[in-house]
Amino acid sequence: MERVDVVYALILDETEEKILMVQNIKHDNWSMPGGAVEAGETLTEAVIREAREETGLTIEAGDILAVNEAFMERFNHHTIFFTFMARVVGGEILIQDTETIADTAWMSIDEADKWMPYHKTGIRSLLEKAVPYTFQGVEKY
């Protein structure tokens, strides 16, 4: 199986307690903005790029809120999913990746939970704890 890293941005509007979600055309579902890490990208570079492509927003990636893993047999992928806390620092909602994203919506945490059953304890529990992420640079031996 090929290893694939995928990143997601949990963009929270704290005043409204809503999460920004994107509607995926291919699977006709909703998810947090995100996608596969490209060669040569760090996880944070990837989550910033994916959020910009899918929402038009510039984000700052925070700590990791969740790490999930799956064997996607139909694609022959061993996928690791990294969910980052994210904060909007600029831009306006404008989908750039119109081939894969149909719409965006601010959803209540409870509504967003329905689209993400793989976070078994729910999104609220993710917001209670985090793991710092640090890119250590390039090691040359």
Question: Which residue ranges define each predicted feature?
Answer:
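Conserved N-terminal beta-strand and adjoining loop/helix that marks the start
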Residues: M1-I19, A36, M85
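Short, charged/polar surface micro-motifs in flexible loops or helix N-caps
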Residues: T15-E17, H27-D28, E38, V67-A70, ...
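Conserved Nudix-box catalytic region and its N-terminal flanking loop in Nudix hydrolases
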Residues: E17-E53, Y141
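Nudix hydrolase/Nudix homology domain
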Residues: D28-W30, E99-Y141
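A short coil-to-beta-strand element that immediately follows conserved catalytic motifs
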Residues: T58-A66
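Active-site-adjacent beta-strand/loop module that shapes the phosphate/pyrophosphate-binding cleft
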Residues: A70-I93, A105, L126-L127
